[in-house]
């Protein structure tokens, strides 16, 4: 199991390294993309980078599927282990119930046994039965010790299996936590790509808007230039006409002088000249009207110039507003930096709290392990001490029984002797009564015999009292032994309850540990969210500042160009337009070259990613084979657990059999003692 876990960890580390490399590549790509945006590439490089990022999701999806399969298998194993635990608990409860039932049945059978059937058995048979029962007791004790040893070994093996399961569970939790982190990172990258898309769209919109405004202004400027040209042409025509009219007026004046000289001679011609003068006056009026129109057009041009000056002032005001916005963006950036510093401080505090919590967890683990070890040691010591005490008590009881049996045999011999002496004395008394009264010596003999009889009766009474006291002592010893047995059972039950309570405490501690882990995960997520918010704020501030600076620079450049165009002549504007066309052609060529390079790099990356996909598929196949091996090992472990359960059941059966044998032996001893007492009482009655 440990080797398989190490292999899984190595493979997961490799996959994490590959993902980190991809992430680092994309992070290094972003500033190049921004530089290309600032130089003139703007949207195309971002589109190419996004197309490159679109090749990553299949790898990530396969990795997530593989992790989900592993998590499902872990949940299946957890459920299976829980079911096994429940089955073990049910088996233990059934064994206890059967043990109690057998004990009650044996006690009832022993109580139902009839007494007084074997009163006339011999003492030798009783001794043999006692010896056989003692041997059975010794064998039962040996089997009990052997069963306890096997039970301890089985419990140790179960503890080792539980430790392995806990280690596997902790590693699975670590895998899940790392998977969550990776998913969060992927979500962050996706959000960043979306934001870059939005930023690119905004930049494109601003560029389109700026181009539209530039084209509109150029159109207006061209219209104004056309109007100026037309006005200048009209002025030139009007000036030429005025010159012509002045020349005509001079010629007319000369002609008038000539005509004044020739008035008298050319009266007929005066009417024609008057007509011509009227025509000339009408033409002059027309020229004057044209001059008025030209003056009005000049006034219109002056008003247009004033409007342009107003627009320039408005643009200057907008520039000042944009500068104010720039200062506001800088202040916002400063605020975001302060927020970042506060977030870093909170993060450090959270890390310190996490370290303290980890130290507290380690302390709790140590204390719990010490408590469990102390409880186990105490339980073992108490069991061993109680076992030794019971063994000592059993040996003492055996010694006392042997001494009491010896005393009983001696006392029975004395009683038999006293009975024989009594019979002999009674026979002698009968002989004396038959023969009649004899000498005083015979009378003395009778008195001595009578005193002997009295002494024998006294000794008989003393022996009976001693027998009663011995029987009472045996009863007290039996009562004490039963009380001590009950106390030992109570102690064992108390120890079992203590063990169960400690197990519950361990479960409660594990739950608290899980809660603390969840709290730590939540805190880490909050810190990551704060970091993300701070980074997003920084990025937004930087983007705003860069966009504002770019806009200001573009606007300033545009205003300068407009002013220069208004001041310069048409030639400069044509030259600038040619330069702009050449620059656009150059940028278009550059974009084409960059797109070719990016397509080649994308194809190379796609080929490398395909090779990595094939490698990862091989890794997944290896992982599947390892999972099959793990499943086989789990099946083997289940078989071992079943074998241990069978061994435990056998041990419990042997323990129950040993207890039944001990109970039967104790009952047989009690029956034998009762039979002996009854035999003694019957003998006494017969003698009386």
UniProtKB/Swiss-Prot annotation:
Signal peptide: none annotated. Its main location: cytoplasm. Transmembrane segments: none annotated. Residues 59-108, 152-673 form a coiled coil. The keyword Transmembrane does not apply. The keyword Transit peptide does not apply. Keywords: Acetylation, Coiled coil, Cytoplasm, Cytoskeleton, Phosphoprotein. GO terms for cellular component: centriole; centrosome; ciliary basal body; ciliary transition fiber; clathrin complex; cytosol. The modification N-acetylalanine is found at residue 2. The modification Phosphoserine is found at residue 681. Disulfide bonds: none annotated. It is found in: Cytoplasm, Cytoskeleton, Microtubule organizing center, Centrosome, Centriole. GO terms for biological process: cilium assembly; clustering of voltage-gated sodium channels. GO terms for molecular function: clathrin binding; sodium channel regulator activity. Adapter protein that links SCN10A to clathrin. Regulates SCN10A channel activity, possibly by promoting channel internalization. Interacts with SCN10A and clathrin. Identified in a complex containing SCN10A, clathrin and SCLT1. This is Sodium channel and clathrin linker 1. It comes from Mus musculus (Mouse). The lineage of its organism: Eukaryota, Metazoa, Chordata, Craniata, Vertebrata.
